[in-house]
Design a protein with these regions (language model features):
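Phosphate-binding and adjacent anionic-ligand microenvironments
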Residues: 293, 297-299, 320-322, 340-534, ...
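Conserved phosphate/anionic-ligand binding catalytic regions in large, soluble enzymes, centered on
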Residues: 38-58, 144-147, 233, 237-249, ...
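Short Gly/Thr/Asp-enriched flexible loops that form oxyanion-binding sites at enzyme active sites
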Residues: 100-108, 151-158, 246, 308-327, ...
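N-terminal small/polar loop signature for handling phosphorylated ligands or for N-terminal nucleophile
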Residues: 88-151, 254-312
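An N-terminal, well-structured beta->alpha segment
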Residues: 7-104, 192-230, 241
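Gly/Ser/Thr-enriched, mixed-charge loops and adjacent short helices
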Residues: 33-42, 152-286, 291-292
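Glycine-rich phosphate-binding loop plus the immediately following alpha-helix
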Residues: 157-187, 327-350, 355-364
Length: 572
């Protein structure tokens, strides 16, 4: 079907609401916009769907949400008895999130699949926990995480509480594609409730149990009881779903001196105080830093709209504020967990940590120093969730901690996605431990570098929007795959990992990577440095990860800057 036909079909055949019709009519004389909205369908993958809000096949809207839900229902109904376990639905503070969540519940009800719909916005980790706690067959979160406000998304979770894997995503996609837009009916809400196909859930059903479980993750609860009231923290939920659970967990473990950025406390679908609601963006911390200076806090927490990611800012020795990178936060938490458990005599002999392949190699050194095995996965926290399940199924290892450089952290097994509530609790505990020793979180980070070496990690993104951008990304990856660099910045490429082929090639020898296939290229360099290239799974970007290390901070930073310049040329 050509784009013009698809546009006309949407406009005249099934777009039933006035807003969608008005949106379509507004682009009637804009062929480029029509092309972008209708040249392809919004893709569904392991990260679900994510896109710009608006009318069209390639946009996030209630018609794509309903169609995706009908496809998911068909997929689940391949086993009708299991489908009766139901699907849990959560949503964040974005535009249309509540409406999309309601539509999702009522499409499921129409198909005979029970829906558990939260009574208000909830973070990703509570959804993940709820799927497991309620023994549901699946879960859905309406969110676009940290994307700009014009985006929304639809993430699907399997019965273990982790995002669906590639095989399930492919199966769901096949059912979605075979579903006409006109074949996505909604059951009346009152009828769905009367038939037991729609249940509204809240604190009593899920949240209270989740918070109780998170409290068990404290490694030194007595330390929190002694030092918690002395610690001054500034927290911003950046207008998202973390406001209630993060403040609650901190309060219940004894951290009472938490100042919340009032301008960012309440839900705001436009995220009007920031350019992007992203806790790795310095702009998200401007108001928090102002408040921290006013109240004398030395630590700032920020969670993104769906509260699966945590950003941290710390006061340095000279009084400046420094934002910790996701890699630094991950290494602080890993080192604290392992060192504290070692001192307590509770570090298991079969302990394991897990990180993504694009996360810092510093974590490998830390884990090795405590005799803990580090496992690596592809990007996407679902793969960390898979490893947790493997450990439990086989009894081979005890999971201790998992993280991604993109500010996602987890130390529990009762949640299977990154957890900003869990991470907030642990960083607060580390801050208390530091205070008890007369040092700061910043000092703790520097002590890790002094012990293991200085590691610098940078991510460079090249945005390539639209149909042409997608083609260009494929060309770049094809060229690099066929003609990999032999050296970068004067350093020899010692090995090439091609995750699409599933191979690692070094000195003419080829061995399997042991990971699922994915369009990722990883160039190992001398002295433990490396560069990784991959297309983003959620945005029209190609990402370049540059990791360097040296015994001296300045040397590590200069090497990283030089290597970035050399590596960026690969994307031209």
């Amino acid at each position: 079907m050509d784009v013009k036909t698809a546009y006309e079909q949407w406009l005249h055949d099934f777009a039933a609401d006035a807003d969608t019709i008005a949106d379509l009519k507004a682009i009637a004389n804009d062929p480029a916009e029509i092309e972008d909205r209708f040249y392809t369908e919004l893709s569904f993958g392991t990260a679900g769907m994510r896109g710009v809000l608006g009318a069209g096949m390639n946009r996030m809207n209630r018609y794509n949400v309903r169609r995706a839900t009908k496809g998911l229902a068909k997929y689940l109904l391949q086993n009708p008895q299991e489908a009766q376990r139901g699907v849990v639905i959560a949503y964040d503070s974005r535009r249309f999130s509540a409406e999309f969540a309601r539509d999702t519940a009522l499409v499921l009800a129409q198909e005979g699949v029970p829906a558990y719909l939260f009574d208000a916005l909830r973070p990703v980790p509570i959804l993940s926990y709820a799927v497991r706690h309620l023994h549901a067959i699946a879960g859905i979160v309406i969110t676009a995480s940290h994307n700009p406000p014009q985006y929304n998304g639809y993430k699907v979770y399997a019965e273990d509480g982790a995002q669906v894997g590639p095989e399930a995503a492919d199966g769901i996609t096949a059912f979605i594609r075979s579903t006409p837009y006109t074949d996505c009916k909604l059951m009346d809400e009152e009828e769905a409730k009367a038939k037991g196909l729609l249940k509204i859930i809240g604190n009593k059903e899920v949240d209270d149990d989740y918070i109780a479980q998170v409290k068990t993750l404290c490694i030194q609860p007595e330390l929190l009881a002694e030092e918690g009231s002395k610690l001054s923290i500034v927290y911003t939920p950046i207008h998202g779903s973390g406001n209630v659970p993060v403040r609650r967990i901190l309060r219940e473990v004894g951290i009472s001196n938490v100042s919340v950025v009032k301008e960012q406390e309440l839900p705001d679908p436009n995220f009007s105080t920031v350019k992007v609601p992203n806790p790795e963006d310095p702009g998200a911390f401007v108001l928090a830093i102002k408040l921290a200076d006013e109240v004398g806090a030395k630590v700032i927490f920020a969670t993104d709209p769906d509260c699966d990611r945590l950003g941290v800012a710390v006061k340095t020795g000279n009084g400046d504020w420094q934002l910790l990178t996701g890699n630094q936060i991950g290494c602080v938490l890993l080192h604290y967990i392992l060192s504290t458990k070692q001192k307590q005599g509770t570090l298991p002999k079969n302990g394991a940590a897990v990180k993504s392949i694009v996360s810092t190699s510093l974590a490998n050194k830390i884990a090795a120093s405590f005799g803990v095995e580090m496992f690596e996965t592809l990007t996407g926290f679902k793969f960390i969730g898979e490893k947790i399940q493997q450990f439990q199924d086989t009894g081979s290892h005890t999971f201790l901690f998992g993280f991604e450089e993109s500010y996602g952290f987890l130390s529990s097994t009762f949640v299977r996605d990154k957890d900003g509530v869990n991470a907030s609790l642990l960083i607060a505990e580390v801050a208390c431990a530091c205070a008890a020793q007369g040092i700061t979180l910043y000092d703790y980070v520097q002590s890790i570098f002094r012990e293991y070496g200085y590691f610098v990690e940078k991510v460079v993104s090249k945005t390539l929007p639209g149909k042409d951008g997608l083609s260009r990304m494929k060309e770049i990856m094809k060229d690099l795959r066929e003609n990999p660099p032999k050296e970068l910045c004067g350093m020899k490429v010692t090995a090439v990992r091609d995750y699409l082929k599933g191979t690692r090639t070094a000195d003419g020898k080829v061995e399997p990577t042991g990971l699922p296939k994915s369009d990722v290229l990883y160039f190992e360099l001398e002295k433990g440095n490396w560069v990784c290239v991959r297309p983003s799974g959620t945005e029209p970007k190609i990402k370049l990860y540059v990791n360097t290390n040296a015994s001296d901070k300045a040397d590590a930073e200069k090497l990283n800057a030089d290597l970035r310049v050399a590596s960026e040329a690969l994307l031209d």
